[in-house]
Every structure is written in C-alpha cells, then in structure tokens.
C-alpha cells in the first residue's frame, strides 16, 4: 500500500496531463476494490488492509478514503462537497433541482463534469461573472468544494480567452480568494487530484494574461490575492509594483516588490501593459517537491509581461526572518509543476529580505524564495573561521621565517634540500589559499561581484589543490630515496619534476574546471564564492584529486616503512633511510590530517548542513598547518 505522503509527492511531480491520467487510473482501480463498510475507518488496522471508505457528513456528497499506516487508519483523500449546480446558483434552485450533482460535478479529475455550471455562468452573468460569488463564499472550504472551485476557475480561464475586463477579474479573484484562505491550507492535502494547486496557479495566470486595461491602473485587492495592472508608456523611466499582505489572520504584513528598470523598458518599442499578482498563502499550498527540505518563505509573485522584457528584479520580505538560513530565488515551472532555481539568481540577502533577479518567459511567470530549514551559518562558526584562519596564517608565516633562517644548515644533502623545498612550497600554497579564502568571504556574492568571485574561487581552488599535490611530491621523494634508478637523475630535473607536480597539475585542473563550467554559469555556487555543487558538481574537481592523493600517500608511506626495515644500522643507506623516515613521519601526520579536514568539508556539502560539521571543518582547517609549522626536525638536523 503506497502511503499518502509518497502518493502526494508522486502525483505532484507529474505534469498536468500525466496527473489527470494517473487520477483516472486511480479512479478506475478504486471501482474494483470492495470498500469496507462505512463509518468504521477508525482505530487499529492491519498494515496490508484494503482502503477504507467512509461517507461524508450530512448535506454533502462524496466520500473519504482512509489508508492503514503504522496500524492506524489515516485519511488519504476526501471528495466531500456541498457545491453543485443546485447550490452554486442559489437564486435559481428550481432550475437544477432535477439534476444529480454526481452527473455535473467530478471532483476527482479535470474533465467536462463542470461544463453545465460554466455554460450556465456564461449565460446568466457573462458581463461580470458575479452570479456565483455568493454561493461560493457561503460554502465551507472542504476538499471537495476546493476541487469544484478550482475546476470552475480552470474552465473559465480556458473559455474566456479574450474580453477579460476589470469586472470579470474582480469576480474571478473573489472566487480564488475563497479557496486561498489560510484556514483552507490543510484541506488541500486531501484533494484527490494532487495537481489542483498547480492548475489553480496556471489558471489565474492564464486568465490575467487576457485582461485588457483601458489605460488606467487596476487595483483588485482581496485578503489572499492582490492584482495590480497598468499601461506603461514608451520610454518610461521604470516601474515598480509593491504588495503588502498577511499570510494569516495573526501574522504581520509581508511585502513584495516587482521592479522594472528603465533599461529593460527601453526594449519594448511601444506602450504595453503589465499585470502582477501576489499570493501570500499559495506558497504553503504549492509543494517544493524537487527541492528537499525547502519551504516557501515569501509572497508568490506572478507577473505578465511582453516577451521583450527578459529580466526583472524582485524584493521579497521574509516570512520567517533569520540571518542563519540561506534563501534561494526560484521560479515556478508551469510544465513540470515544481520550483526551479534556474529561473532566478540571488542578488543580495539579509535576515529580513532577499533581492532576486529573474527571467520570466512562457514557462516561468511566478516567483518566490525558498528557505532551507537547516541552519548553515552562525556567529560561532564565523568567529571560529576567522580566528582559525588568523592562527593558520600566523603559523605559516612563522614556518616560512624559520625555513629561511635555517635553510643553509638543513639543505646540505640533496634529499634534505628537496624535502625542505616541499615544506616551503606547502607553506606558501596554504598561506595563499588562506588569503584568497578571506578575499572570497568578503565578497557579497557571485551576482554582485561575479568577476571577483570567479577570480577568488579560481585561486582558492588552485592553491588548495597545490597543497595536496606538494604532499604528493613529498611522497614521490620517498620513492626517489628508495629506488636506485632515481639516483641517476640530476638535481635540476628533480626540482623541475616537483614543481610540475606541485603547480602544473593543479593549474591544469583549475583551468579546465573554469573553462568547462563558467560559460554555462555553473562554476560558482549561487550564494557563495566557491565551486558549484548542485548544478555542475564542479566541486568534484577539488574533492576527487585531493582524496585520491590522500589515499596514494597513505599507501606509499605504508610500503616504504616495510622496505626501510631492511636497512641495517651503519650501512651505506642508513643515513638516507633516516631522512626518508623523517619524510614518512611528516607525510603520515599531514596526510590523514588534510584528508580528515576535507572529509568534513565534503560532509558539509553532501551529507547535510549540520553546524557541527562546519565547526569541525573550520577547526581542522585552521590547525592543519601546525605539524609543519613547528619544524622540529629543522633544529635537530637531517
């Protein structure tokens, strides 16, 4: 038995036509199931029990379907409705008294079941559509009635493709306002056609797109839907639409603004009309099914524009105000029935509001912001990061200063020279990586400082990779000291090889990553100056080489330790073996520390947004330099 939650997610992911076919199939399969007796869908049940159907309360038609989950009956769908052709036209009851509501209303699928009501509406009040408003507003907001109104709005939007004026829009908005009430949100869960909320949004946008204005501002305001429209003259200096609405009866008002810049308006050769609609509760109804752990945190703003306008700016005040939770600007994909991050980019964000730049088109006309419920930032994390980076930078500077002081004394042999060459370059690359990391953190984001973000991210990527590749170079030194064949290589050749490994390989990887992902705007993360993960997985260009080097180094150290046990004290190889063992110790300490550090770094991106992972990563990142920073062996000699 599929649970109600998973059935909900499955249907919502489907496009409108697919949802209709699914619901039709579900309706047919329901007819083949022998329903249990009415009024027994309560209490304990068996997990493999067949669905239970219960009759609706008096004065309503339909039924309620229950499924057994965790050995208890839970309501899955409800088709109970009081609205029908008999009640919706309250003043003409006799006209439809002989018609059965079952023959005129089908709440479980979008078909021609409400054609009679729609046709009668067009006959009775085609001028303003007002003859059904009283009947709808008096009806309870139960799931079946919501489905009836959604179907009616859908039919009206497909019937009236022209000649929509302010009066019709006023009545249409009043019908939608009734089912968008905050008190009805929980009942949307039980509507049999889970795609109803998508159809509602699409129907409202479609109907509004046919609205014709007579040169004056249109302002149709209801509690849960607000429509603004105006005619923009040619060469206008810019327009903005501001909404201020309550999400529920007890909350404060939340604002949303749509901004059209002068530059964009110049692209339209003649006067045109702009229509914008705001919904305070529709975000709670529309499920962000393809973006896990995300909730709508602002008004849903729809905008109908001429096709020449490609960019708009939107300012969303946050419903839940938090500086520790990142938001994402999104557009509603009308074909795929889901929120899509590709439609918008974040320009600026603080604890109270988010500014987005979006690209409306025939698929994207509605926009909002999503908020992750997981905390990914905190003042503690910020302090630890900057204090840790300060400690790291100071340690690295001390390390390089000590290396400079003792350089002539500790580089007398070839292998010692090469060893300290690696140590110095590890310190330099880690120092540069930390500096560029700080530069990247001070940039406000990839939208405001895109070129600066690209530059900072490139160098952070390059220098952190260089740290790992110089660690690999130190491992290669072990092989140089153990394998006789390498003794024939001149010192200059070895130095060139080390620099090729330490800087050449990271440079190639960093350049290829930038060249492949940046043209499609997939190089940077939307909210920070670092490699993208969600869209292009560019972060793998750092993760894969780094962890591969960690594994190779650990294997190399293990093999060399086994081999060096054969060298006897006083033998000709003994002194070189002692130097090699020092390198092994150094690598054996640094490699796990570096690997552990970036293992936690990966966990912060892939395995969730736990604050503990971020704090551990910041601490290890600050301390990973300390074994080399002490440089104990420099004072002991080689």
UniProtKB/Swiss-Prot annotation:
The keyword Transmembrane helix applies. Keywords: Disulfide bond, Glycoprotein, Membrane, Signal, Transmembrane, Transmembrane helix. This is Adhesion G-protein coupled receptor F2. Disulfide bonds join 329-356, 344-358. GO terms for biological process: adenylate cyclase-activating G protein-coupled receptor signaling pathway; cell surface receptor signaling pathway. Residues 233-377 form the GAIN-B domain. It comes from Rattus norvegicus (Rat). The chain crosses the membrane at residues 387-407, 423-443, 466-486, 494-514, 542-562, 587-607, 611-631. Most adhesion GPCRs undergo autoproteolysis at the GPS domain. ADGRF2 is not autoproteolyzed at the GPS motif because of the lack of a consensus catalytic triad sequence within GPS region of the GAIN-B domain. Pfam families: 7tm_2, GPS. It is a multi-pass membrane protein. The keyword Hydrolase does not apply. PROSITE patterns: G_PROTEIN_RECEP_F2_4 (PS50261), GAIN_B (PS50221). Residues 26-386, 444-465, 515-541, 608-610 are extracellular. Residues 329-377 are annotated as: GPS. Orphan receptor. The gene is Adgrf2. Glycans are attached at residues 155, 219, 248, 293, 311. Belongs to the G-protein coupled receptor 2 family. Adhesion G-protein coupled receptor (ADGR) subfamily. InterPro entries: Adhesion_GPCR, GAIN_B, GAIN_dom_sf, GPCR_2-like_7TM, GPCR_2_secretin-like, GPS. It is found in: Membrane. Residues 408-422, 487-493, 563-586, 632-638 are cytoplasmic. GO terms for cellular component: membrane. One of its GO terms (molecular function) is G protein-coupled receptor activity. Its main location: membrane.
């Amino acid at each position: 038995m599929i649970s109600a939650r998973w059935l909900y997610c499955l249907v919502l992911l489907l496009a409108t036509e697919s949802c209709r076919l699914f619901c039709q199939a579900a309706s047919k399969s329901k007819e083949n199931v022998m329903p249990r007796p009415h009024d027994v869908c309560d209490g304990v049940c068996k997990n493999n029990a067949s669905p239970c159907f219960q009759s609706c309360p008096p004065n309503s038609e339909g039924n309620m379907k229950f499924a057994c989950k965790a050995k208890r009956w839970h309501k899955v769908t409800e088709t109970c409705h009081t609205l029908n052709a008999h009640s919706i036209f309250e003043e003409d009851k006799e006209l439809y008294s002989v018609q059965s509501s079952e023959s005129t209303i089908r709440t479980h699928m979008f078909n021609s079941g409400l054609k009679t009501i729609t046709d009668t509406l067009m006959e009775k009040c085609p001028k303003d559509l007002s003859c059904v408003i009283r009947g709808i507003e008096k009806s309870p907001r139960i799931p079946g009635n919501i489905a009836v109104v959604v179907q009616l709005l859908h039919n009206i939007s497909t019937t009236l493709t022209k000649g929509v004026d302010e009066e019709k829009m006023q009545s249409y908005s009043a019908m939608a306002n009734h089912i968008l009430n905050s008190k009805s949100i929980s009942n949307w869960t039980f509507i049999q056609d889970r795609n109803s909320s998508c159809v509602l949004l699409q129907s409202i946008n479609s109907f509004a797109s046919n609205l014709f204005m007579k040169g004056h501002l249109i302002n149709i305001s209801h509690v849960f839907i607000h429509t603004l429209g105006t005619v923009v003259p040619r060469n206008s200096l810019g327009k903005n639409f501001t909404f201020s609405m309550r999400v529920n009866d007890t909350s404060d008002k939340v604002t949303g603004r749509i901004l059209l810049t002068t530059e964009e308006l110049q692209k339209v050769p003649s006067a045109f009309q702009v229509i914008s609609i705001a919904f305070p509760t529709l975000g709670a109804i529309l499920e962000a099914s393809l973006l896990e752990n995300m909730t709508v945190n602002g008004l849903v703003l729809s905008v109908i524009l001429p096709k020449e306008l490609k960019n708009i700016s939107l300012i969303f005040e946050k419903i839940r105000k938090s500086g520790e939770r990142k938001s994402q600007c999104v557009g509603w994909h009308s074909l795929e029935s889901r929120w899509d991050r590709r439609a918008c980019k974040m320009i600026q964000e603080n604890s109270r509001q988010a500014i987005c730049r979006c690209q409306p088109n025939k698929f994207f006309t509605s926009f909002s912001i999503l908020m992750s419920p997981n905390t990914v930032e905190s003042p503690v994390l910020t302090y630890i990061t900057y204090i840790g980076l300060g400690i790291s930078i100071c340690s690295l500077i001390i390390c390089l200063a000590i290396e400079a002081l003792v350089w002539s004394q500790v580089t007398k042999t070839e292998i010692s020279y090469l060893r300290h060459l690696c140590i110095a370059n590890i310190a330099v690359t880690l120092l540069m990586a930390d500096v560029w990391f700080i530069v990247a953190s001070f940039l406000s984001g990839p939208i405001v400082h895109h070129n600066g973000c690209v530059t900072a991210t490139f160098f952070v990527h390059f220098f952190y990779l260089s740290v790992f590749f110089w660690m690999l170079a130190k491992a290669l030194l072990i092989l140089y000291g153990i394998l006789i064949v390498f003794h024939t290589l001149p010192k200059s050749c070895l130095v060139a090889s080390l620099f090729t490994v330490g800087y050449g390989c990271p440079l190639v990887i960093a350049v290829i990553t930038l060249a492949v992902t940046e043209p499609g705007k997939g190089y940077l993360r939307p909210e920070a100056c670092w490699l993208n993960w969600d869209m292009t997985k560019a972060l793998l260009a750092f993760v894969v080489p780094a962890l591969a080097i960690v594994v190779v180094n650990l294997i190399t150290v293990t093999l060399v330790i086994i081999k060096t046990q054969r060298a006897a004290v006083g033998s000709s190889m003994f002194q070189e073996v002692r130097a090699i063992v020092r390198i092994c110790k150094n690598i054996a300490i640094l490699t796990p520390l570096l690997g552990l550090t970036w293992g936690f770094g990966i966990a912060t991106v892939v395995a969730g947004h736990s604050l503990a992972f971020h704090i551990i990563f910041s601490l290890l990142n600050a301390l990973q330099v300390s074994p080399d920073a002490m440089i104990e062996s420099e004072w002991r000699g080689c």
